[in-house]
């Protein structure tokens, strides 16, 4: 069985260096991932809510995110309250889920107001990229790099030299 990886992100990456870098890591992953039992890396961009208050924005975005999560997925939330884990541990989770026959892993990146508490509770794993707060565009690039790095770790490729 092949595991599908899905990135669900609030907001759109406009043309420019962030989008180019994100695409580069996605393409690199695709080159290695298929050989490792991954069925591709899909990216779903969800428009930011235009609601006036943060609670409504977060609720609207959470509903759109929930609708985009594939059935029977492992849910990973990128969240400043998440765990700071190293790349090998991150790769270990994804590799183990693949080996256990999980159909999909969905990585969720919230908008400016973050992720709803309900989504965070449903997550199998919450991940933070350090203690700093990052713009969601940068988080997407960091996530795609870590997904590519995961593939290289699982393949024994020399990209990861830690």
UniProtKB/Swiss-Prot annotation:
Source species of the chain: Bradyrhizobium sp. (strain ORS 278)
Cystines in this chain: none
Broad enzyme group: transferase
Coiled coil: none
CDD domains according to UniProt: RlmH-like
Protein name: Ribosomal RNA large subunit methyltransferase H
Reactions catalysed according to its record: pseudouridine(1915) in 23S rRNA + S-adenosyl-L-methionine = N(3)-methylpseudouridine(1915) in 23S rRNA + S-adenosyl-L-homocysteine + H(+)
Protein family (similarity comment): Belongs to the RNA methyltransferase RlmH family.
Binding site for S-adenosyl-L-methionine: 78, 110
Keywords annotated in UniProt: Cytoplasm, Methyltransferase, rRNA processing, S-adenosyl-L-methionine, Transferase
């Amino acid at each position: 069985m092949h595991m599908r990886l899905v990135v669900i992100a609030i907001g759109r990456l406009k043309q420019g260096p962030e989008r180019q870098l994100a695409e580069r890591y996605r393409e690199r992953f695709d080159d290695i991932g298929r050989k490792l039992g991954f069925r591709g890396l899909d990216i779903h961009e969800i428009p930011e809510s235009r609601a006036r208050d943060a609670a409504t924005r977060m609720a609207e975005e959470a509903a759109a995110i929930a609708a985009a999560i594939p059935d029977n997925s492992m849910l990973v939330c990128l969240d400043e309250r998440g765990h700071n884990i190293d790349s090998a541990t991150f790769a270990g989770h994804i590799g183990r889920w693949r080996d256990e026959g999980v159909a999909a892993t969905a990585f969720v990146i919230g908008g400016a107001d973050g992720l709803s508490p309900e989504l965070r509770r449903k997550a199998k794993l919450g991940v933070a990229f350090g203690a700093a707060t990052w713009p969601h565009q940068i988080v997407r690039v960091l996530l795609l790099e870590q997904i590519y790095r995961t593939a290289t770790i699982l393949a024994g490729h020399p990209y990861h030299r830690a």
